[in-house]
Amino acid sequence: MYKRQKLVAGGTGKPDGLDKGYFVKPTVFADVNNNMEVARTEIFGPVLSVIPFETEEDAIKIANDTTYGLTNYIQTQDSEKVQRVARKLRSGMVDVNGAGIAVDAPFGGFKHSGIGREAGEHGLEEFLEVKAVGGWSN
């Protein structure tokens, strides 16, 4: 277990009723700051670290202060804020209000969260070879 943050929900062990297989409890930590290991590690599991912030710019700075960049999440009903904040986030995907990413949208991250894209038009480019032809003909 990580030190200093407060366990709000979940924790170690499997969820009730799931004795077989590889499952972990959905887990929420509070009192997290961006210097803690739980905030600096790319965790592939149902783990949420709640990091307080004062301003929108502060939240963007915290979100971008990582070597990873798979997905960011924005919760707001303000569509202008969504556009403004999403442009500043250094991640391959931005999920708004828990709607999820469309199945035909490109999937992939920035920085150490992956190179390239899967799905969508950008995902197809991985299987194509581009050729440049220069010069002129009579």
Question: How should each PLM-predicted stretch be described?
Answer:
Residues K6-L7, G69:
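Residue-level detector of anion-binding/catalytic polar loops
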Residues L7-G11, I74-Q75:
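Short beta-strand segments
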